């Protein structure tokens, strides 16, 4: 574990409510020599690659890896921003590894992936925010897997037009940028992000004709009405696909869970999302942005 994760957070610590049964996930790994989870893990370790699955302590890691799917994380494992809910380490990142895009492509080919999700830490230390690194990775994957769907889950890149153009030119199948939470909570939850800036990124991508996607994490203190307003904002800028999931506190020093949202509310929000124009809404307590990402394009309950 990166020692930077041990830095105390600045918010006041509170006791989270007890985790309900519907969120209790077994993380038991089978025999490491004969299971898909081990195959994915070994491939990632061999290529010295980072995944958001591990870095963000995703509860679905076992499930997704058993399906031979993973979300690659570019730019190292240290983020230049510090969000109170996120388990990715923050600090001063190392220089980009120029061979990382090639290794990600080799891993994708070895695993026979049909849908690759690529994200990154925030790299505000770079002029283009890491956009060219994304583009190079897409190019390498398409060389070896020309029919593979590629989803890019990008930071806001500070809405720099030159950086966004680099992303657009590599023509991802899905352009994903997560809003994460409602406008009121941004100062507490993601103080270095801006609500309007994230909407602008998605609006620009939608206007350019890309299939756009975003996600919200619930249970951080938002109201149901605020969630619906946020969904309306996303729909108004042309977002087609939406994911809604439950926030889970990674450690005792992170933002406490304010509420465990019951499954019925997620179902109701899915119906509401469809009613205001989203093409697909993937909503449930354990849903994450890249959970079953290959199915989300056509998912329509």
From Swiss-Prot:
Sequence positions that bind [4Fe-4S] cluster 1: 53, 58, 64, 290
Record EC number: 2.8.1.8
Pathway: Protein modification; protein lipoylation via endogenous pathway; protein N(6)-(lipoyl)lysine from octanoyl-[acyl-carrier-protein]: step 2/2
Essential cofactor(s): [4Fe-4S] cluster
Cofactor descriptive note: Binds 2 [4Fe-4S] clusters per subunit. One cluster is coordinated with 3 cysteines and an exchangeable S-adenosyl-L-methionine.
Annotated localization: Cytoplasm
Pfam families, per the entry: Radical_SAM (PF04055)
GO CC terms in record: cytoplasm
Binding site for [4Fe-4S] cluster 2: 79, 83, 86
Keyword Iron-sulfur tagged: yes
Domain of life: Bacteria
Catalysis performed (reactions): [[Fe-S] cluster scaffold protein carrying a second [4Fe-4S](2+) cluster] + N(6)-octanoyl-L-lysyl-[protein] + 2 oxidized [2Fe-2S]-[ferredoxin] + 2 S-adenosyl-L-methionine + 4 H(+) = [[Fe-S] cluster scaffold protein] + N(6)-[(R)-dihydrolipoyl]-L-lysyl-[protein] + 4 Fe(3+) + 2 hydrogen sulfide + 2 5'-deoxyadenosine + 2 L-methionine + 2 reduced [2Fe-2S]-[ferredoxin]
Alphabetical keyword list: 4Fe-4S, Cytoplasm, Iron, Iron-sulfur, Metal-binding, S-adenosyl-L-methionine, Transferase
GO molecular function, a single term: 4 iron, 4 sulfur cluster binding
Radical SAM core domain segment(s): 65-279
Family of the protein in this entry: Belongs to the radical SAM superfamily. Lipoyl synthase family.
NCBIfam families linked to this entry: lipA, PRK05481.1, PRK12928.1
Entry protein name: Lipoyl synthase
Organism phylogeny: Bacteria, Pseudomonadati, Spirochaetota, Spirochaetia, Leptospirales
Gene label: lipA
């Amino acid at each position: 574990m990166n020692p930077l994760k041990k830095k105390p957070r600045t918010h006041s610590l509170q006791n989270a409510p007890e985790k309900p049964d519907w969120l209790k996930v077994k993380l038991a790994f089978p025999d490491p020599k004969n299971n898909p989870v081990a195959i994915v893990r070994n491939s990632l370790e061999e290529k010295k690659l980072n995944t958001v699955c591990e870095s963000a302590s995703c509860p679905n890691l076992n499930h997704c890896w058993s399906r031979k799917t993973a979300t690659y994380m570019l730019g190292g494992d240290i983020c230049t921003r510090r969000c109170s809910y996120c388990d990715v380490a923050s600090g001063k990142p190392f220089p980009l590894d120029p061979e990382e895009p090639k290794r990600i492509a080799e891993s994708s080919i070895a695993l026979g992936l049909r849908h690759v999700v690529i994200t990154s830490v925030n790299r505000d230390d770079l002029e283009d925010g890491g956009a060219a690194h994304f583009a190079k990775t897409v190019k390498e994957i398409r060389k070896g897997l020309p029919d593979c769907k590629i989803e890019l889950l990008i930071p806001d890149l500070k809405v720099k037009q030159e950086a966004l153009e680099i992303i657009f030119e590599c023509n991802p199948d899905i352009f994903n940028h997560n809003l994460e939470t409602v406008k009121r909570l941004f100062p507490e939850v993601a103080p270095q992000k801006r609500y309007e800036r994230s909407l602008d990124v998605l609006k620009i991508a939608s206007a350019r004709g890309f299939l756009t996607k975003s996600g919200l994490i619930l249970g951080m203190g938002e109201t149901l009405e605020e969630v619906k307003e946020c969904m309306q904002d996303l729909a108004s800028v042309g977002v087609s696909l939406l994911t809604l999931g439950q926030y889970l506190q990674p450690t005792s020093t992170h933002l406490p869970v304010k509420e465990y949202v019951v499954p019925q509310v997620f179902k109701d929000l899915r119906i509401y999302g469809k009613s205001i124009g989203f093409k697909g809404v993937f909503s449930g307590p354990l849903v994450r942005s890249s959970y079953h990402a290959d199915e989300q394009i056509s998912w329509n309950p």
